[in-house]
């Protein structure tokens, strides 16, 4: 948290993990894990260089290997605590986890807003879960996620 003119300002940087093996293979990943590719590691290290002058107090990330590896690559050489939380994981796609995207979304199939994947979550579930986690660490935050 940074203080500016008597007001505490909290800045959030929302960063997506680098490319994963499943990204490259066109497979759906939410809660299932897939390691970063060499390109994914390189992407994270490059972002770390671009953010080198940005002061971070703490890093919250999902418990997925790809998120933790991305955070470690970005923050390499910096004394920033990384706090993994399962509540910051991506959307669970349930039975569709690790399936090929082209098989699920063939012929332009689109799922309606609010659709809950069998054994998984819908967008509202994710927003509620992530919001609850962020409010736990920042109780006075005023936040809206859409």
Task: Name these PLM-found stretches.
Residues 1-8:
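Short, Lys/Arg-enriched N-terminal segments with co-localized hydrophobic residues
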Residues 10, 55-57, 141-146:
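Short coil/turn segments at beta-strand junctions that form active-site/ligand-binding loops
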Residues 11-17:
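Short, hydrophobic/glycine-enriched beta-strand segments
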Residues 19-68, 119-131:
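Loop-to-helix element that buttresses phosphate recognition and phosphoryl-transfer chemistry
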Residues 21-22, 68-69, 78, 132-146:
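Active-site-adjacent alpha-helix immediately C-terminal to a catalytic or transition-state-stabilizing loop
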Residues 23-24, 91-96, 113-117:
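A short acidic, helix-capping loop that chelates divalent metal ions and anchors anionic groups
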Residues 46-109:
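Phosphate-coordination/substrate-recognition cap region in phosphate-metabolizing enzymes
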Residues 106-125:
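Short glycine/proline- and acidic residue-enriched helix-loop micro-motifs
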